[in-house]
Amino acid sequence: MASLGKYVSKLAGSRVLVIGGSSGIGFGVAEAAIQNGASSVFISSSSQTKISSAIERLKENNQSAKAQLHGFPCNLGSPDTLTSEVENLFAEVAKSGKLDHVVFTAGDKLAVGKLEDFTLDAIRQAGTVRFFAPLVVAQQLRKHLDESGSSSFTVATGGATEHVSKDWSIMYSYLSGLRGMIRGLAVDLAPIRVNAVAQGPTDTEIWSYVKEMGYWDNVTGHLKGRMTTGEIGKVEDVVEAYLYLMKNKNTSGSVVETTGGTLLS
């Protein structure tokens, strides 16, 4: 069999952890890593049931692949247990050796609403998964990633920071802060590369309720009107941004946009 060549084999033999990998874009990243030759793929989410289901789907969809698949639960939703949960996750993954890439796509409910209605505790909670968890994960990377420019940490964020909407003050604060975090971590963790993917509307399981209630066409019609592509993003397209950041050893401290042209409209 002919060699795949240097342009499509950059992830061959790599070990990839996807935090938030049981569904949506995270699942897509895990599958893409498998199809790009990763030797071991680890996925994590808060639900063991979802992890088991995801691993079965990955095996079914990629029967000819040789990658080893592993899954470990990790609940990022509580500030009180966040550090211990992340430490336990990396302790489990470390039993198989060091990683080459960590991808963070975990998320939770967006704290959108009238600012005065949020307590300080609620404001803090709003950033636990999307802001504080990536920082806590970053604390583990020197120990558990190969310290070289081939290694990377990629974090999902939203493309919404460029458009100011009413009642989004809390989320804008965290989403904007995450972009600064990426630049700081790129310096602090060097030579490990740190980047982010800013995602626009993407058709994932998070929209299931909207589809079930019959609102999908109305909601997406409004969104499409703000997108120069005129199409809601597909997981297989958005995932290409993550592959680019894992493969490109010349990129660190960057935010790659995959928003369907939303930022231009």
From Swiss-Prot:
Disruption phenotype: Does nor affect the production of the fusarubins. Induction: Expression is induced in presence of sodium nitrate, and repressed by glutamine. CDD domains: SDR_c (cd05233). Keywords: Glycoprotein, NADP, Oxidoreductase, Signal. The keyword NADP applies. Its EC number is 1.1.-.-. GO terms for molecular function: oxidoreductase activity. NADP(+) binds at S22, S23, I25, S45, K50, N88, R130, T204. Residues 1-32 form the signal peptide. Glycans are attached at N62, N218, N250. Gene3D superfamilies: NAD(P)-binding Rossmann-like Domain (3.40.50.720). The keyword Oxidoreductase applies. Belongs to the short-chain dehydrogenases/reductases (SDR) family. Short-chain dehydrogenase/reductase; part of the gene cluster that mediates the biosynthesis of fusarubins, highly pigmented naphthoquinones responsible for the coloration of the fruiting bodies. The non-reducing polyketide synthase FSR1 is responsible for the condensation of seven acetyl-CoA units to yield a haptaketide. After rings A and B are formed by aldol-type cyclization, the PKS-derived product is released as 6-O-demethylfusarubinaldehyde. This is Short-chain dehydrogenase/reductase fsr5. It comes from Gibberella fujikuroi (strain CBS 195.34 / IMI 58289 / NRRL A-6831) (Bakanae and foot rot disease fungus).
